[in-house]
A protein has these predicted regions:
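Sec-dependent N-terminal signal peptides
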Residues: 2-13
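Short loop/turn motifs that connect adjacent beta-strands in outer-membrane beta-barrel proteins
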Residues: 16-21, 42-48, 97-106, 152-158, ...
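Extracellular loop and loop/strand-boundary signature of outer-membrane beta-barrel proteins
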Residues: 21-25, 73-80, 128-134, 170-176
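Membrane-embedded beta-strand positions of outer-membrane beta-barrel proteins
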Residues: 22-28, 37, 50-54, 90-92, ...
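Transmembrane beta-strands of outer-membrane beta-barrel pores
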Residues: 26-32, 54-60, 96, 113-119, ...
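Short sequence motifs at beta-strands and strand-loop junctions characteristic
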Residues: 27-31, 80-85, 101, 134-141, ...
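Gram-negative (and chloroplast) outer-membrane scaffold detector with strong preference
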Residues: 42-127
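Outer-membrane beta-barrel "beta-signal"
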Residues: 89, 178-193
């Protein structure tokens, strides 16, 4: 039975999802910012697509600021955290207005879920000392929001999404157990050959 269901599911996925897009971009969120890579498979009806993405976040402290050190002549960050998160998310986009809008943009609703690998380094010392043996944990995560695909020449597109990033932690990291918040997600995509 499992083999039969696997065969049906794989046939459904590969037969109906012919357009594959690869992309990269930036994320700007309540807890920090980062970069990501993504892969999207669009259904032949163009009503929905499946997504997978890997993100890299640099988490900022709420009181972190940059100052100028007159002694060294360098700018430096004060009050920062040595915390990185690597969310790996899978989900779908739903395009409710396919065939109803004549221009080259497509609004959508999106939901993604997955895991978040958190790396918590020491707060002081050199770069090597801070990241020599970081505390790690894997916790659930997700993203829910809305967005628009702007289709460009040459089968490329720019996607802009806004929504809620859900990043609860299994245990406290740097005094917090939840790094959830608003997120702006900008992606530059190109159809794979």
């Amino acid at each position: 039975m499992k083999l039969f269901l696997s065969l049906i599911l794989s046939t459904f996925l590969y037969a109906e999802f012919g357009q594959i897009h690869n992309g990269f971009g930036i994320d700007i969120g309540s807890s920090g910012s980062g970069i990501f890579i993504t892969r999207q498979a669009t259904h032949e009806s163009e009503k929905f697509s499946l997504n997978g993405e890997l993100r890299f976040y640099d988490i900022k402290a709420s009181d972190e600021t940059i100052i100028y050190n007159y002694y060294s002549g360098q700018y430096q960050s004060v009050g920062g955290k040595s915390l990185m998160m690597l969310p790996f998310l899978f989900g779908a986009n739903y395009y409710p207005f396919v065939g109803q809008i004549e221009n080259n943009f497509s609004p959508f609703i999106t939901a993604r879920v997955g895991g978040v690998l958190s790396l918590d380094g020491k707060e002081t010392g050199t770069f090597r000392e801070r990241w020599k043996s970081p505390d790690t944990q894997i916790s659930p995560g997700g993203f829910f929001g809305i967005g628009i695909d702007f289709k460009l020449v040459g089968q490329s597109s720019v996607s802009v999404m806004v929504g809620l990033e859900v990043l609860p932690m299994n245990k406290k990291i740097d005094g917090m157990d939840d790094y959830s918040g608003r997120l702006i997600h900008i992606s530059f995509n190109r159809r794979s050959k």
